[in-house]
Amino acid sequence: MARITVEDCLEHIPNRFQLVLAATYRARMLSQGHAPKIESRNKPAVTALREIAEGKIGLEMLKKVPG
């Protein structure tokens, strides 16, 4: 399996801070039992980054978080 890099994710979410927030929220959702949007046997944080790198998840993750 290929390594995931920040540069892969930055193509979809160009702001590093927003990238971290989106990945964190998605990883939390995955750890709470939500279904992953890709096939992965990785931990939730890596799965979240892979979803972002593949374009399955984007900035919409930040809009789903209660403010």
Curated annotation (Swiss-Prot):
Catalytic activity: RNA(n) + a ribonucleoside 5'-triphosphate = RNA(n+1) + diphosphate
Keywords: DNA-directed RNA polymerase, Nucleotidyltransferase, Transcription, Transferase
Pfam families, per database record: RNA_pol_Rpb6 (PF01192)
GO biological process: DNA-templated transcription
GO MF term list: DNA binding; DNA-directed RNA polymerase activity
Complexes and interactors: The RNAP catalytic core consists of 2 alpha, 1 beta, 1 beta' and 1 omega subunit. When a sigma factor is associated with the core the holoenzyme is formed, which can initiate transcription.
Name of the featured protein: DNA-directed RNA polymerase subunit omega
Species the sequence originates in: Paracidovorax citrulli (strain AAC00-1)
